[in-house]
Amino acid sequence: MLGINYKTINSNSVGYKTDYEMRSFDFEEFLLAKGYSQTQIDSLLLHMQKLEPFTENEFELFRELFLDFSVLGGMPAVIKAYLESNNFSKALQIQKQLILDYEEDVKKYSTGVEQKKILEVYRRIPAQLAKEFKKFQYTKISTKARSKDYFGCVEWLKDAGVINKCDCLNFPELPLKGNVDNNKFKLYFADTGLLVASLDEEASDELHENKNLGVYKGALFENLVADALVKQGFGLYYFKKDNSTL
């Protein structure tokens, strides 16, 4: 895959296994983990579908729950640590360890110089999302970086379930896949909580203490939406023309 050398994995006999795509918790699963019933969750969804206003108390409750979820993300070990300790510090420790585990997996399942390139792409995502225009730029990794040298690294991370890729469209027309500009795209973390844990200390503290999702020029909002769409089975696309973005 464009220069990526996957280490050999023992093959499985065709027809003797079933594959499942596993992702971190979404907001509904977070609420279930918090002890809310499916009936309560369905009622919440119905209110939104009907555009019925919540009471002030309901609004504040669900707002706080969503902000908590936005900072924590949906990794099961992180949610478990938070529910057991009722504080973000323990959850943040788990998040940072998971990030290190991801990097160890890159070293384990990729080979040669590709290891370095994959890690460079992964580690640069938070800084790239901090830009006003969040299109991923290889030149922000190195002034001499070229797309043909790094594109396979992006696909490696995407296939591994570590990131989500949002493709730019030449035209906002169907079929979307047929209108993709392969040289323009945005990259998001597959779990928003891990993005929060990857930010610089000041931004991370602001999010954990004050839950200010406006830091990083709206990157957290974009990552949350991308995460939610992918978990619902949608592909990610954007369209930019002149000075406007759709």
Feature names for model-found ranges:
Residues 6-130:
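Interdomain motor-coupling "hinge/lid" segment immediately C-terminal to the ATP-binding subdomain
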